[in-house]
């Protein structure tokens, strides 16, 4: 049986995060907190989109908060590994993921993480402005952005000033050669969506959540590919 609530599939290489994402049925915003993908009551639940964010992952640019359980050693594709994103060494080669949707693949670029009280996980609680996503992402990066990305940005900026201006100009963007190669170099852009992945964690408070932030943009089709 196909579940009409399915809206995407998240996959983060190098982690156990590999699971379907759903939208909760109307009137039951936390249904998948205690029900699996088949609709059966289960402590495992299923990763689901915050009802305040709508019922699609493809209405971009936008803000999308996705919740998933942390099941520890038996995580089975859920969100437990997001708790590890506070560790610089662990996350260093796990900064990208893919969110597959009916509209196409969304490239995820993780750029920040923080631990908050469980009561502070909504859009307004996190100080996210739907009218200024670019500014919101910049504020998040300043508050809890990954240090290695900030260092990379500083190095790229320095390279620009010591001899890479020509390559930068050829791209028509700021940020140096690394920005040229990808078009996204740790900086928020107007076309990006903000994704927030939320899971339980157990470090500071008795009821806390780890939030991992990612910029997301639709993957461009290869040259010559049909749309």
Which residues does each PLM region occupy?
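Solvent-exposed, non-transmembrane regions of membrane-associated and secreted proteins
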Residues: 1-227
